[in-house]
Amino acid sequence: YSLLIKRRELNMERVIKVGHLGLILTRPLLNLVTDSAASATAMSTGKRTVINRIAKSKQGKDQETILEIAKGMGKSTGLVTTTRISDATPAAFGSHSLSRENRFEILDQFLEKGIDVLMGGGIQDWMPKKTRVGDFSKISLKAGAEKFSKRKDKKNLIKEAEKRGYQFISQEDELIKAPDDIKLLGLFSSSHFLMALDRKKSDHTGIPNLALMTEKALKVLDRNEGGFFLMIEGGRIDHAGHNNDAASVVAEILDFDEAVGAAFQFCKEKKDTLLLITSDHTTGGTGLSYIVRNKWGSDFGSLENLKAISRQGASFEKIWEEFGQKPTTDDIKRVIYKHTKIKISKSEAEFIKNPILLSPFHVTAYKNKKKVYTAHAIGRILAKRYQVSWSTGGHTNIPVMLIGYGINSRKVAGLNENRYIFDVMKEAFGLSVIHP
């Protein structure tokens, strides 16, 4: 897509050409398929654990994270994401909890540890109960200014962070203007960031892209002559996969790839830095596929399918919001065409209006099942035009790439478990790795 539509090579490909490439297995303890908590815990601690655990063993014992090791060595530390900052992946690097759902406990630990840079979404978790996002920040209406706190107590974590020396920001322009010699807390949306398709410059959301956050985090952390650890996550890639939203998956990966470019440029100028690029798991079981049209042949896809994906201008999340509570089939056809330039039939609109569980693998364990089923129905309809196949609405156990560049990056080559990533990072700090 990047080569044929954007006419440019991915930054990840550029890193692969001059760095090293390996494959990572993601299986957790006790199960065949992982979640982000277990996988991120394996990467951050070098220890496999069970589903939902945050940097704790199966028995509930804290496991030391690479961020804590860095902090103990006097290095600066940072967590950057496009999800809530308390979400599973950043949580597994900066906290310990029996469940990824313990968001308030996780945030308390972030501040107690003094993590130097914290940027992402989820300001609702930082504000006293019954308070409005817009009263605590400059977050835009599109990014959730009218939303209310998720807390059940009167704790004001933003004020507590400021007392601990953090500068709090909530808009892209504030991020650009923020000095580099500070501890930085950036919360740019009420919950997760809007999808990349819905936060383009022209949307005026005030939400920065991942590359801009990466550049600022590197400037802040690099002031420490003793070095730093930084975890950067394109977390909404996973959510787009859960929704079976091919165009959003592409847009989120491209947003992440811009951040890779920023990190790669930094590392090329710093010969003592290790850059690792990977994923905690795959989502959706997706790929381009051919379609059997008739007994005389099959359609193996073409540039036109990629062009169709490129014409989708909004995520499924925005599309289903525009449907409203009780859309007619004409409403659905109109909204789909508005955002995709694809004309769907009345029967296809009916399929979207009355969505069903598409398969046993299109999971039901969501709080808002109706939205998820609707997204999967849209994904199934558009898949015919995009020639994209989806096997599930959940995670898969497909191995993921591990790309390395810089100091100790030769160690990424080969096939390894995700817990091995911890060893590579620890050795890059000049520490020995001893396995019992």
Please place each PLM-identified region on the residue numbering.
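Mobile, glycine-rich extracellular loop/lid and propeptide segments
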Residues: 1, 43-49, 57, 63-94, ...
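Glycine-rich oxoanion-binding loops at beta->alpha junctions
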Residues: 52
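A post-motif C-terminal structural segment
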Residues: 1-41, 90-436
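Sequence-pattern detector for short linear motifs
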Residues: 30, 55-56
